[in-house]
From Swiss-Prot:
InterPro entries (UniProt xref): IreB (IPR009309)
A Pfam family it matches: IreB
Protein name: UPF0297 protein Swol_0469
Similarity field: Belongs to the UPF0297 family.
């Protein structure tokens, strides 16, 4: 749908997609830990650069994270952080 100049674009992640992203992040986090990496540092590197080399191929973690757009990952992380820090539900 074309946007008018200055109009805010709406982005909505479906609940099933959110659960898929959470499961992938969990798997990637565990794989990075198992290989001795700092999962947070590696995920930040990936999120900033988009370079999959930050993610280990152990347990198919690299293949899994490449199936999800970084904006979807960011939405799930941001939503979780804000809900936990502000004590609010959806």
């Amino acid at each position: 749908m074309p946007q008018l100049p200055g109009e805010t674009v709406s982005f909505k992640l479906e609940r099933d997609d959110e659960n898929k992203v959470r499961a992938i992040l969990h798997t990637v986090y565990q794989a990075l830990q198992e290989k001795g990496y700092n999962p947070i540092n590696q995920l930040v590197g990936y999120m900033i650069s988009g370079e999959p080399a930050y993610i280990t191929s152990h347990s198919e973690a690299r293949n899994l994270i490449c199936k999800v757009d970084r904006d979807e990952i960011m939405e799930v992380l941001l939503k979780s952080y804000l809900q936990n820090s502000m004590g609010k539900g959806e």
